[in-house]
Amino acid sequence: GLGDTDLGKGVHIDKLVQVAHDVTVGANTAIAGCAAIGAYARIGSHCIIGGAACVAAEVHLADDIVITGMSTVNKSLSKAGVYSSGTMVSEHQRWRRNVARFCRLDDYMMRLTRLEKECSKAHE
């Protein structure tokens, strides 16, 4: 069945926020307008969920986490800090290609750095 949603002391929830069933929100957390929290999510204390952000069902967020506006959180986060996601609107096919490339961007940069070092040594 549906369980209770538990809001800790000092929680601030803005207008047009959707909070599903069986959600726990820790003390002194703020959730900005148009955000959505999925069922069974656990939000820690002293967190900030930005406007139009989405926390997927069953995701757990540690204490002291900031989710910037319009971000989608699809996995649990155990380390305090600021997290962002999202891209600007574009045609769907282009967006799909760019997201795939973006996910490999760090690997590309490490490879490029390694190749630059190899080229520098070859020209010495």
Name each region found by the language model.
Residues 89-124:
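Long, leucine- and charge-enriched amphipathic alpha-helices
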Residues 1-91:
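Structural signal for interior beta-strand "rungs" in well-ordered beta-sheet cores
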